[in-house]
From Swiss-Prot:
Function text: Specifically methylates the cytosine at position 1407 (m5C1407) of 16S rRNA.
GO biological process: rRNA base methylation
Gene name tied to this protein: rsmF
The protein's name: Ribosomal RNA small subunit methyltransferase F
Keywords assigned: Cytoplasm, Methyltransferase, RNA-binding, rRNA processing, S-adenosyl-L-methionine, Transferase
Coiled coil: none
Family: Belongs to the class I-like SAM-binding methyltransferase superfamily. RsmB/NOP family.
A matching Pfam family: Methyltr_RsmF_N
Major localisation: cytoplasm
Signal sequence extent: none
Localisation: Cytoplasm
Reactions listed under catalytic activity: cytidine(1407) in 16S rRNA + S-adenosyl-L-methionine = 5-methylcytidine(1407) in 16S rRNA + S-adenosyl-L-homocysteine + H(+)
Residues of the active site: C247
Single GO cellular component term: cytoplasm
Amino acid sequence: MAQHAVYFPDAFLTQMREAMPSTLSFDEFISACQRPLRRSIRINTLKISVADFLALIAPYGWSLTPIPWCHEGFWIERDDEEALPLGSTAEHLSGLFYIQEASSMLPVAALFADDNHPQRVMDMAAAPGSKTTQIAARMGNRGAILANEFSASRVKVLHANISRCGIANTALTHFDGRVFGAALPEMFDAILLDAPCSGEGVVRKDPDALKNWSPESNLDIAATQRELLDSAFHALRPGGTLVYSTCTLNRQENEAVCLWLKETYADAVEFLPLGDLFPDADRALTPEGFLHVFPQIYDCEGFFVARLRKMSSLPAMPAPGYKVGAFPFTPLKGREALHVTQAANAVGLLWDENLHLWQREKEVWLFPAEIESLIGKVRFSRLGIKLAESHNKGYRWQHEATIALACPTHAHAFELSVQEAEEWYRGRDIYPQTPPAADDVLVTFQHQPLGLAKRIGSRIKNSYPRELVRDGKLFTGNS
């Protein structure tokens, strides 16, 4: 594999020599950093099983190598990458997989280790959504996830990925993560803090990642990380699990941050060793039981993962000073709720008791029940999924609800051909040889919902959101 020129500050190399265990080769570290990163994907098991996905893409000639710490994760090699980018494939557009770096699958694997089944989870720094969607898949779209993102510009990307993957159990917030310990004390069964960091592990993806690197900036970042971890630990319930991770390699932002928490709260913090997380995990194991993944160990990005348990309750932080404001939604109950449910079921939209109906003017939403106790404590950017807008003739069902809730075996489902699916993704109406019988049509391809549409005469009127419409090649040549 070709090498690329990576910029290494001298002080960084000195720091890495000190941080790297004697069992690892520094020359191999430099060599690994200069190799381009292997592409990897994670199959979205909310939509398709691993076995069914592998059978589906078998004719394409894709070469998939299992990632040892993620059953649904694979390194991928494709001959047609230039002709058809991975993100433009039909399987990606319909949410069957997520393009995710292999090492970034580690934190969620650690969060759910030892058969852990949390019901309310926070992803404190969630964008662009790889780990939130991975958490949702591990939870089977049940319970609730609070996905927070401090960067306003990245919240939109986070929502787009959650929607594409058919996730219904998530609430989005836009806060500095340091507020949650005070705002939501001991409210979560599990928390993932994939902390902002100096990014030393990503040089294989970005050769200039260290252009602005300095030892001083590492210390500044570590100070912020301690405050975020402190907040996360206060938001975690006693007995709950917290995973702290970064994509950097220095000890100040990794081991030292976790040891600071232990020194601060002593017996309230228990480190949970990760040496048995997957075969050969001990090759990256630190004396504390953390995983410090240098890129040459598993041929992936550099990464750090620590898992800990909160053993006892902590004194509350000072109450937050902000005002949340009036909540603009009201629960939908009784006859109204039954009417919406029956109308949705009639077009193939189904949900269970994990989701509750709420209303705001003409909008109908589904909120995860597990998040309702947080209402009034924080301000949400988006909560649950928008199910419909009501109008004189009934309901206008929303695209994100169709992707998350539609049953592809419903009587109104209409399976598109490859050519018809390509037309659908391009925003064009479909003229099938044999039109569907029903006026309300659940459009599917590869037995996955693409949208709800209306049959008008012999055509199916395209309802694919304009902002999602694609041009160019969309399908693998021999699909």
